Amino acid sequence: VHLTGDEKSAVAALWSKVNVDEVGGEALGRLLVVYPWTQRFFESFGALSSPDAVMGNPKVKAHGKKVLGAFSDGLAHLDNLKGTFAQLSELHCDKLHVDPENFRLLGNVLVCVLARNFGKEFTPRVQAAFQKVVAGVATALAHKYH
């Protein structure tokens, strides 16, 4: 993904304030609530029967933290996202058979969660930079599908 120096700085500055545990759980939880068909990949997580059940589910929170940890790794390697996410792409494609569109959906949900958490600090300029990043990560995760 190509970011200008200013965009990289904006992403790094905001990301340094992100609570990965909370934001990860909220982002994955919202994905499962807003796009309920994505729940089929998480049937082993137990109670997903209502928005409250999803958002309070400790397995959703734990996996969201794991997902955002991988996203953080990607932020450290913006010039090599395909390489950074190669193993995860293979896992999600070959073993888990996740629809690659879900990566784009999760990226957009993450942007919504960041906007909710950071309010005025999440300016249109910062959002534009994050949209590039989440699109790049989604493309990298979908790489093995092509």
Swiss-Prot record:
Domain of life where this protein originates: Eukaryota
Positions annotated to bind heme b: 63, 92
Residues in coiled coil: none
Example of a GO cellular component annotation carried by this entry: hemoglobin complex
Keyword line: Heme, Iron, Metal-binding, Oxygen transport, Phosphoprotein, Transport
In-chain residues carrying the UniProt-annotated modification Phosphoserine: 50
Tissue: Red blood cells.
Quaternary structure annotation from Swiss-Prot or TrEMBL: Heterotetramer of two delta chains and two alpha chains.
Family to which this protein belongs: Belongs to the globin family.
Name assigned to this protein: Hemoglobin subunit delta
Organism: Saguinus mystax (Moustached tamarin)
